[in-house]
């Protein structure tokens, strides 16, 4: 039986030199890489937290999904990841395609398989991250803080 996605996850931020937040990458991996390089991001000492919506609109959505597998990346689930998961699960692609999911259709078969595998892993992304750092507690969500 599959375990449901944790709604809330905690991160011990004190183990990282710097914690960087990035919202709505939307498939623009090279732009993110340039910014991280500019900030002297060190994947062995720093943490990148994505605030969701790593896919759609930009040219590198598959690579952005694969970024989530890196040891130095954590993420909360955004509405674009949820749209993609729902579209594939229920074979109803229209809403996702209207919101930038056309990159998936343009992929070769083997890349679509990779994207599906990566999107399945997104089911385990929390909706809320709580980071405890030297400066206190920080709560990260994509858009709305769930009131339940």
Regions found by a protein language model. Give the residues of each.
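Active-site neighborhood of divalent metal-dependent phosphoester bond hydrolases
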Residues: 61-131, 135-137
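Beta-strand-turn-beta hairpins that frame and shape the catalytic cleft
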Residues: 13-19, 131-138
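Divalent-metal (often Zn2+) His-rich catalytic cores of metallo-beta-lactamase-fold enzymes
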Residues: 137-148
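Carbohydrate-interacting/catalytic domains
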Residues: 6
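Core catalytic region of metal-dependent phosphoesterases/phosphodiesterases
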Residues: 2, 12, 18-22, 27-96
């Amino acid at each position: 039986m599959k375990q449901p996605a944790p709604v809330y996850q905690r991160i011990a931020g004190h183990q990282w030199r710097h914690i960087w937040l990035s919202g709505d990458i939307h498939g623009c991996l090279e732009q993110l890489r340039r910014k991280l390089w500019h900030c002297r991001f060190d994947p062995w000492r720093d943490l990148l937290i994505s605030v969701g919506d790593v896919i759609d609109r930009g040219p590198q959505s598959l690579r952005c999904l694969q970024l989530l597998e890196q040891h130095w990346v954590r993420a909360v689930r955004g509405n674009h990841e949820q749209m993609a998961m729902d579209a594939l699960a229920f074979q109803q692609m229209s809403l996702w395609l209207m919101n930038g999911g056309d990159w998936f259709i343009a992929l070769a078969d083997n890349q679509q398989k990779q994207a599906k595998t990566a999107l399945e892993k997104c089911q385990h992304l929390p909706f809320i991250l709580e980071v405890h750092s030297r400066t206190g507690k920080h709560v990260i969500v994509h858009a709305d803080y769930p009131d339940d």
